Amino acid sequence: MIAKIALTNVHKSFGPKDVLRGVNLEVETGQSLVVIGGSGSGKSVMLKSILGLLTPDSGSIKIDSRETVGLARRGRADIDHQIGMLFQNGALFDSLPVWKNVAFRAIQNDGMNEADARDLAVDALKRVELGTELLDLSPAALSGGMHKRVGLARAIASKPEIIFFDEPTTGLDPIMTDVINHLIRNCVQ
């Protein structure tokens, strides 16, 4: 079976600091992987390298057997369509209402019209147990737990084949941590 994601001997340094030192891993379709490590151990650097936000110093990163290291942004478009991402800080735009944050990729990358994009946002928000009363709010008006849910809705809105979560429960109380973990399990099954 061909790996969905394959990293081979991936290295990344920042000045004298070696962050990724020969990382090798394969993740098959349908498989989940949790990467655990201390602060500064390279978890986020590895994710950003897979996402194409950082370029490794050496090594290979393949998605569906397609080399992504060195691939121009334009060449990544079909790969990026397969990927959803929930960033640690949510990475929502306060200048946009919740629904436009959720449907951001569909509007910006796919040229979806606003009516369809709003419907897409409603559906994704429903999947993370949020209602339509939030659609026109700014993310700045949301609680921490709601902010994470909106970020999760954005990550799943395009129904990606691959979803990355970078510390999705950081900063949440234990009850909201359980809620977010439950929603993640439900959304990725």
Where are these regions (language model features)?
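Catalytic Walker B motif of ABC-type/P-loop ATPase nucleotide-binding domains
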Residues: 163-166
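Conserved ABC ATPase signature
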Residues: 138-142, 146
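ABC ATPase NBD coupling module
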Residues: 68-84, 114
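Helix-to-loop junction immediately C-terminal to a conserved catalytic motif
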Residues: 51
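Helix N-cap at the start of a conserved alpha-helix in ABC-type nucleotide-binding domains
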Residues: 174-176
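Conserved catalytic motifs of ABC-family nucleotide-binding domains
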Residues: 159
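Conserved ABC ATPase "signature" region
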Residues: 67, 115-133
